[in-house]
From Swiss-Prot:
Protein name: Small cysteine-rich outer membrane protein omcA
Single GO cellular component term: cell outer membrane
Organism this protein belongs to: Chlamydia psittaci
Location of this chain's protein in the cell: Cell outer membrane
Segment forming the signal sequence: 1-19
PTM entry text: N-terminal amide-linked and S-diacylglycerol cysteine-linked to 16:0, 18:0, 15:0 branched, and 17:0 branched fatty acids (ratio 6:5:3:4) in the EB stage. The exact distribution of fatty acids has not been determined.
Lipidation (N-palmitoyl cysteine): 20
Covalent lipid adducts (S-diacylglycerol cysteine), residues: 20
Annotated GO MF terms: extracellular matrix structural constituent
Amino acid sequence: MKKAVLLATVFCGVVGLTSCCRIVDCCFEDPCAPKPCNPCGNKKDKGCSPCGVYTPSCSKPCGSECNPGVQGPQAKGCTSLDGRCKQ
């Protein structure tokens, strides 16, 4: 019985993590992105997995995984020499 409960808990935890937007995955501000590019704002884009795939990077256009037309300052390659985002 304990094994069944443990397996159910693990399974539900894994499914839950992959099917929803976790705060640790994407609910943060990309310092290089305009407000519309906040990944939590469009975490459930059609045809795209949940926003766990979002990786904030100044060198990558915001929303490129789901919306190729959405671009922010990242599209201009605004990274500094040390790889951090320019303000």
